[in-house]
């Protein structure tokens, strides 16, 4: 029986030492699904609401007791007795109880914890791994990792405008081999930084955060690390950026290396980098409400460059439909806590893939050891995954889960490889 008999919630710590919500759902079969909710540093204005307590005397106002209590007192009584396998129905109940567009009543952190824990309990009842429970027999492709090895922006206080400089390994049509390549490049980069007398301390997502003279210097460092590690830039390792441009947008211009530039000038920089470097993906290249620049950049670069909307779309089908109508962007970043339920996440991914958008499953800068997104990346047939650098346990946990899934799939498993960007 998949009848839900217990829903428990608690306050735990995320990777930044901030409180977050953890939920456990247990069924009559004795199976328990546990989910911990992540939290972002650079968040989109259109994201679902993360409910914090605001009590400055406790965790500096960042406690989540209100969300935890909402799970216990408002959600649990409504779903105990229901079948855990009725995911769509349960997610609808969660939204109905909340009653707001952005889930500000119960908190998206409360709702998501329950939604994911229900799915994990149901998967165990069905004796299936989560990726197979979510995706069925078609869940067989491993995503390409976008590895954030150099941090800037809101993730590091080091003078770099761009938030994430990433390497993208596509080696031997193998996830495991690509992960190995990324790891070797990461350690090679560390040696290069140390030799230059630069800091090898890491930021929130495990990438290095040295003080550099320019954004372009960061790109050059990545190119050197790729070559020194024995790989071929533009052949089996590529580059990707998360600009997080909303953080830089002020009064119609973008803060850039100590000054301000126009959207047209910023687009020109991206185009010049695309010619000089093996750059395959730019995330949030423009601010979340700078639709004109998104449309212009997609028209000029969209045929050859992946242009990911994160703050632009916030995993929300309504925002994504706006982008499709305007022809803004060509790829969707998928963050489950931006929308708040597994069902709505599926709807956003399905809408994107039907319209030939690439989909990229993503962590948040405030993560936990929960590996759910690795299973969801495979289960939802996402082309790529973002889960940080090659250190910090909350990041490597997801990479390791994908190794297990690749092993579990055996000969049926396929790696998206370069096809992830076509």
UniProtKB/Swiss-Prot annotation:
Listed binding positions for Mg(2+) are: 242, 283, 310
One GO-annotated biological process of the protein: glycolytic process
Keywords (alphabetical) are: Cytoplasm, Glycolysis, Lyase, Magnesium, Metal-binding, Secreted
Please state the protein's primary subcellular location: cytoplasm
**Annotated catalytic residues:** 205 (proton donor), 335 (proton acceptor)
The family this protein is said to belong to: Belongs to the enolase family.
Checking NCBIfam families in the record gives: eno
Function, as annotated: Catalyzes the reversible conversion of 2-phosphoglycerate (2-PG) into phosphoenolpyruvate (PEP). It is essential for the degradation of carbohydrates via glycolysis.
Task: Name it.
Answer: Enolase
Q: To which species is this protein native? A: Bdellovibrio bacteriovorus (strain ATCC 15356 / DSM 50701 / NCIMB 9529 / HD100)
Q: What is the lineage of its organism?
A: Bacteria, Pseudomonadati, Bdellovibrionota, Bdellovibrionia, Bdellovibrionales
């Amino acid at each position: 029986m998949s009848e839900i008999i217990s829903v428990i919630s608690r306050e735990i710590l995320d990777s930044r030492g901030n409180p977050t919500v953890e939920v456990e759902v247990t069924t009559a079969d004795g199976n328990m699904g546990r989910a911990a909710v992540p939290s972002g540093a650079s968040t989109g204005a259109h994201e679902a609401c993360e409910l914090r307590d605001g009590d400055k005397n406790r965790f500096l106002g960042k406690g989540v007791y209100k969300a935890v209590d909402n799970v216990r007192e408002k959600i649990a009584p409504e779903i105990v007795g229901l079948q855990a396998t009725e995911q769509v129905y349960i997610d609808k109940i969660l939204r109905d109880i909340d009653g707001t567009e952005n889930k500000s009543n119960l908190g998206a952190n409360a709702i998501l914890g329950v939604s994911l824990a229900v799915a994990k309990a149901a998967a165990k009842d069905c004796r299936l791994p989560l990726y197979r429970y979510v995706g069925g027999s078609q869940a067989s492709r491993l995503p390409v990792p976008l590895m954030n090895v150099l941090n800037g922006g809101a993730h590091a206080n080091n003078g770099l405008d761009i938030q994430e400089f990433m390497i993208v390994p596509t080696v031997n049509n193998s996830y495991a081999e690509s992960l190995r390549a990324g790891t070797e490049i990461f350690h090679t980069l560390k040696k290069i930084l140390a030799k230059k007398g630069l800091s090898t301390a890491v930021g929130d997502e495990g990438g290095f955060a040295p003080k550099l003279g320019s954004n372009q210097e960061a790109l050059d460092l990545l190119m050197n690390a790729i070559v020194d590690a024995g790989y071929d830039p533009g052949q089996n390792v590529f580059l990707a950026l998360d600009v997080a441009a909303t953080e830089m947008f002020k009064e119609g211009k973008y803060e850039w290396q100590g000054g301000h530039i126009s959207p047209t000038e910023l687009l020109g920089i991206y185009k010049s980098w695309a010619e000089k470097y093996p750059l395959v993906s730019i995330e949030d290249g423009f601010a979340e409400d700078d639709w004109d620049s998104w449309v212009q950049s997609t028209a000029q670069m969209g045929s050859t460059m992946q242009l990911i909307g994160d703050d632009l779309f916030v995993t929300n089908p309504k925002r994504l439909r706006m982008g499709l109508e305007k022809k803004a962007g060509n790829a969707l970043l998928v963050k489950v806590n931006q929308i708040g339920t597994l069902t709505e996440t599926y709807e956003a991914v399905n809408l994107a893939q039907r319209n030939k958008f690439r989909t990229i499953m993503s962590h948040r800068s405030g993560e936990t050891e929960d590996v759910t997104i690795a299973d969801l990346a495979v289960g939802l047939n996402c082309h790529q995954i973002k889960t940080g650098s090659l250190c910090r346990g909350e990041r490597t946990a997801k990479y390791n889960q994908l190794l297990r899934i690749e092993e579990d799939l055996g000969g049926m498993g396929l790696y998206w490889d370069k096809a992830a960007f076509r």
